[in-house]
């Protein structure tokens, strides 16, 4: 089983991402978080250690890039996939360790490639 964290402050988008992942990765065990702080709490307080994290970038409070930096430190083996509706964030993701950048409008077409790039399949 591959534990995959999904963090998106829009629950509908998180559920769409979850469904897309399940269609292309049978071994996925997904867990959705609506805030970066909820995901960080699961990691630091519950010992949750996802092997993959699919992170929206634009979120209230802490953005997905800052969340990725913290996950990089807390769970070094976690492969980060950024998911956003805004191409303008592309340059900023290089401040973190990540494996893929997916535009939300291309989710169904790209998520399989992104998951394969993590090396967890």
Language model regions located:
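Two-component/phosphorelay signaling modules centered on CheY-like receiver
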Residues: 2, 11-33
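Active-site residues of response regulator receiver
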Residues: 8, 55-56
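Acidic, metal-coordinating helix/loop segments flanking the phosphotransfer/catalytic sites
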Residues: 18, 32-52
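Acidic catalytic/metal-coordinating carboxylates
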Residues: 35, 63-66
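Short amphipathic alpha-helix used as the core "switch/output" element in two-component signaling
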Residues: 41, 65-77
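The feature encodes the CheY-like receiver
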Residues: 60
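Alpha4 helix (beta4-alpha4-beta5 surface) of REC/receiver domains from two-component response regulators
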Residues: 66, 70, 85-102
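C-terminal output helix
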Residues: 106-115
